[in-house]
């Protein structure tokens, strides 16, 4: 089953009418993944025996019988969950993450776990124990990261929807690089229980699909309260599909100078064209400033690395995960297991975080970073007092070549300069396809105030209806 021209509504109609059975859909999906993944390497685990739930009611749940991909840092009962790390190469969870339980209740079919940067730390899906994932638009390019496997699986027509996680842009940047829609909800909108932790104050599970409405359908299911996660909001979840097809007349759209100045040439023209489309439809365009954007990258890497160094202390070779052989004593077990189990990028982040949290550095680095984070939040609050959404480029460039930046951490980190601030502020943000630059997709980022994902869906759906990017086929998947 190839999903390049399918969406959740079209599949639901075929399933409900009997034109297609959920069993056949699952089998055909797995077969197509195995065939096309020879090009992409988007999957770590493919479930050969993937089966739909019994007694599916297609009239009550749009997700009934729909195959969905899961990023491999989201816990799945009885299905190997590795976070793309040698440290967890044999980890078999005994419970489901809350989002998985909710999707099962809705009747979704799970077909496997997607590739990613190890422990979600990366921007290219090259930092994976299972090898790099390839971009469906050009197999020599990266798919972005860390949710690159999920993005490539959707863009390559392997599935119609996938879950990802976003700590500093890990849903939006791959969505932009692969020409799909990806949304990071408000921090606290979706339960993080069962998400393998990277940066606990930044992490958020989100959705990646080819069509905007499909993400709304999935977010309807996974959003909402959870007794296992004290940070998740218990506020009522609106029906996000109600924002699809709405008019944007009168929508107040802020365009940050700092974001537009970060791009030039053809890329700026593509982004500006989408902004002009909103203006032509009656949206009110306001140029604004987010002055602390220039501090976002160093601020993020101090906070995220500090939280990561704490979260990753649990991987010691004792309770679970990789355990080194030929060790002499307990300390040797710790040192060798972590040295051999973690990849280079993980060790780099642990060292950075441990330094920032050390007694002699805490006040100079982590405490100062927390203050800068507050200033970034204040910037957004001021803008949203007079605007409904903020739009601009998702990334500063289209997808780069595999191997081009993997050995240059500073250059790799700067890929996140336009996405990081939304995580620091905890606001919802998404990327919707804007067009092509040199044959590769670029995305328009849309941000809104906390818990106003509806404005994002309204804006993104309008852009999608206008440019119809979903009609394009990734050139790397053409026979």
Swiss-Prot record:
Keyword check for ATP-binding: yes
Entry annotated with the keyword Ligase: yes
In its UniProt entry, what is this protein called?
Answer: Glutamyl-tRNA(Gln) amidotransferase subunit A
Q: How does it assemble?
A: Heterotrimer of A, B and C subunits.
What EC number(s) does the entry state?
Answer: 6.3.5.7
Q: Where is the signal peptide?
A: none
Which PANTHER family does the annotation name? GLUTAMYL-TRNA(GLN) AMIDOTRANSFERASE SUBUNIT A, TRANSAMIDASE
The reaction(s) this protein catalyses? L-glutamyl-tRNA(Gln) + L-glutamine + ATP + H2O = L-glutaminyl-tRNA(Gln) + L-glutamate + ADP + phosphate + H(+)
The active site lies at 71 (charge relay system), 146 (charge relay system), 170 (acyl-ester intermediate)
Q: What domain of life is recorded for the organism? A: Bacteria
What biological function has been recorded for the protein in this entry? Answer: Allows the formation of correctly charged Gln-tRNA(Gln) through the transamidation of misacylated Glu-tRNA(Gln) in organisms which lack glutaminyl-tRNA synthetase. The reaction takes place in the presence of glutamine and ATP through an activated gamma-phospho-Glu-tRNA(Gln).
Q: Which UniProt keywords apply?
A: ATP-binding, Ligase, Nucleotide-binding, Protein biosynthesis
Entry GO MF terms: ATP binding; glutaminyl-tRNA synthase (glutamine-hydrolyzing) activity
One GO location term (cellular component): glutamyl-tRNA(Gln) amidotransferase complex
Q: What are the cysteine partners in each disulfide bond? A: none
Quick one: a GO biological-process term for this protein? translation
Q: Which InterPro entries does the record cross-reference, listed alphabetically?
A: Amidase, Amidase_CS, Amidase_dom, AS_sf, GatA
The family annotation for this protein states: Belongs to the amidase family. GatA subfamily.
Q: Could you tell me which Gene3D superfamilies the record lists for this protein?
A: Amidase signature (AS) domain (3.90.1300.10)
Q: Which gene encodes it?
A: gatA
